[in-house]
Regions:
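A short beta-strand motif characteristic of beta-propeller blades
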Residues: 24-35, 72-78, 112-117, 157-168, ...
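Intrinsically disordered, low-complexity regions in large eukaryotic scaffold subunits
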Residues: 1, 122-123, 132, 140-225
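Secondary-structure-rich domain cores
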Residues: 61-62, 69-119, 125
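Repeated scaffold domains used in trafficking and secretory/extracellular systems
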Residues: 2-5, 29-48, 79-90, 120-130, ...
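Acidic and/or Ser/Thr-rich intrinsically disordered tails and linkers
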Residues: 1-67
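Structural motif
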Residues: 14-20, 56-66, 102-107, 140-149, ...
Length: 225
């Protein structure tokens, strides 16, 4: 996993698994090296939270909360029997997970579960930044939909009245979903188009076609947030 905060890398050596977490700004936190005994394969990283999860049934969500400098608060939650984590996201003071039982669970950065809601369809992407959380779903007829939320200490505040269509270029797939530095929701597809959501109108506006700025067929742009 790579974003504007840092990198989470998984290593396999001599039958042992480990995780290395590096921060672009060492003032945020020093690098971490963790044994991966729980087969953690999902990660989300914000300036205040590192969230790791396993995708096995009854798997774990493990969170490091960088509450005060190098003083970490670590907590763990085990999913219910038959429930597996399918996605994880983190913001300033919260962690969100989607699960195989169609649950969206919201936790405070300190480990308190604030809310659980049912999700309408199969998860495609789960992203967070600041107080914003966006979820993309696989809808009917292979169309994608999204829901946008503000995450408060008391729970979720919907910013869309219901799941809304997520536009894509013809014959393309969703390539990236995330937020700009100003917390504007953005998307990119394999057709090369990057779009930004106007939260006032609910309309997606084209920002750039990255294919206009590549020289060869194998060139591509990697979006970082």
């Amino acid at each position: 996993m790579y974003n504007s905060v840092g990198i989470v890398k998984s290593h396999e050596s001599d039958g042992e698994s480990s995780l290395d977490i590096e921060f672009h700004d060492v003032a945020v936190h020093h690098a971490l090296h963790l044994a991966n005994k729980d087969n953690l394969s999902l990660a989300a990283l914000s300036p205040k939270v590192l969230a790791l999860a396993s995708t096995s049934q009854g798997g774990k969500l493990i969170v490091n909360y960088f509450s005060s400098g190098d003083v970490n608060k670590e907590w763990t939650v085990e999913m219910m029997e038959g429930e597996a984590v399918t996605g994880v996201a983190a913001g300033d003071n919260w962690v969100a997970v989607t699960t195989s039982t169609s649950h969206l669970r919201i936790f405070s950065a300190g480990g308190i579960q604030r809310e659980v809601i049912m999700t309408p369809a199969s998860l495609v992407s789960l992203v967070g930044a600041g107080e914003r959380l966006m979820v993309a779903w696989q809808g009917s007829q292979q169309e994608l939909s999204y829901s946008l939320y503000r995450v408060r200490l008391t729970g979720l505040v919907p910013l869309t009245s219901s799941p809304q269509p997520l536009p894509l270029s013809p014959d393309s797939e969703l390539y990236w979903l995330g937020f700009s530095d100003s917390l504007t929701a953005c998307s990119a597809d394999t057709g090369g188009w990057v779009r930004a959501l106007d939260s006032r109108t609910g309309l997606w506006h084209p920002v750039i076609n990255t294919r206009d700025h590549t020289r060869g067929r194998s060139d591509f742009h990697y979006i970082v947030r």
